[in-house]
A protein has these predicted regions:
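Short proline/glycine- and acidic-rich turn/helix-capping motifs at secondary-structure junctions
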Residues: 62-79, 134-147
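Intrinsically disordered, low-complexity Pro/Gly/Ser/Thr-rich segments with frequent PxxP/GP/PP motifs
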Residues: 206-232
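N-terminal, intrinsically disordered, polar/charged segments of Gram-positive cell-envelope systems
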Residues: 24-63, 145-159
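Short glycine/threonine-rich beta-strand-turn micro-motifs
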Residues: 40-43, 49-51, 58-75, 92-126
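A short tyrosine-centered beta-strand micro-motif
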Residues: 235-245
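A mature extracytoplasmic/lumenal domain signature
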Residues: 69, 112-116, 179, 187-189, ...
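Sec-dependent N-terminal signal peptides of Gram-positive bacterial secreted proteins and lipoproteins
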Residues: 2-26
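Primarily secretory-pathway and cell-envelope proteins
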Residues: 142-210, 215-216, 245-262
Length: 262
């Protein structure tokens, strides 16, 4: 049976959105994360290493669901509208704040990069409003007062520069291997800032990460690139903490580097 071009394109679009949503939800919700293979690149060689990588993020909670029962057709119609908005080239801050959405049993579940009551209302005003929309995750800000170490058994982490302009959206960090053996690192990270009350909280950053490992020989350095979203949450002057967590010699280690925005 030959499929008409329009039908084939619709099927491809649906599969693409499903896969992208699974990636985003897996990154932002531990309960939806799955075991993945971490691929190491050594020169031109590729080595597949089985490794569970679960990204720490927001706990999954549910808002009060509507008493109304929605049909699959109704939910699917909302999904199509959200897909068209999400794939639009004109990404507004409200759209950039959306990291994924999917169809539940009686709802459309939406994950936001910065999940506050105000941002939820912004979504309903600017993107789509329906009682079927339910927002995933704990409300921000999420407190994270952890501290890490800058060096552990020869593995060190630091920002490429000690300070950056206030409007910065991309920051690079250097991870260096002086452990005496090969070291493999990934791309997942988190960033915290200090609030007015003295507590540190998680700021909106990337929410999905490629499950790939980069291998450093002894003496080599690599780069981890982080992003900030000042159009979603304005950057404020001050010190920020960048975290990279890895298993080193069987120990769960939280590496930390600081940088300043001014």
């Amino acid at each position: 049976m030959r499929l008409k071009p329009k039908l084939l394109n619709a099927i491809i679009l649906g599969l693409t959105m499903f896969l992208s949503m699974q990636t985003a939800f897996a990154a932002c919700n531990p309960s939806m994360a799955i075991q993945q293979k971490k691929v190491a690149t050594v020169g031109k060689k590729r080595v597949a290493i089985s490794k569970k990588k679960v990204v720490k993020s927001k706990k999954r909670t549910y808002r009060k669901a509507s008493a109304r029962k929605y049909s699959h057709r109704e939910l699917n119609a909302i999904m199509r509208i959200l897909e068209r908005n999400f794939l639009s080239e004109d990404k507004t801050p409200a759209l950039r704040n959306v990291v994924g959405f999917g169809m539940g049993s009686n709802s459309i579940d939406v994950a936001l990069r910065w999940n506050t009551k105000e941002k939820q209302q912004e979504f309903r005003r600017q993107i789509y409003n329906s009682p079927a929309i339910r927002f995933e995750g704990k409300l921000d800000p999420i407190i994270d007062n952890r501290e890490g170490v800058s060096t552990y058994q020869g593995i060190s982490l630091k920002a490429e520069k000690p300070s950056y302009p206030l409007g910065t959206t991309e920051i690079k960090f250097t991870i260096t291997n002086h452990s005496g053996k090969e070291f493999m690192y990934g791309e997942a990270y988190s960033i915290t800032a200090q609030g007015a009350d003295g507590n540190w909280f998680v700021v909106p950053t990337d929410c999905s990460f490629t499950a790939i490992g980069h291998v450093l020989s002894d003496g080599q350095s690599g780069t981890i690139t982080a992003h900030l979203f000042p159009d979603i949450l304005p950057n404020k002057p001050g010190i920020y903490r960048f975290f990279y967590e890895e298993n080193i010699d069987g120990n769960k280690v939280l590496l930390m580097a600081t940088f300043e925005l001014k």
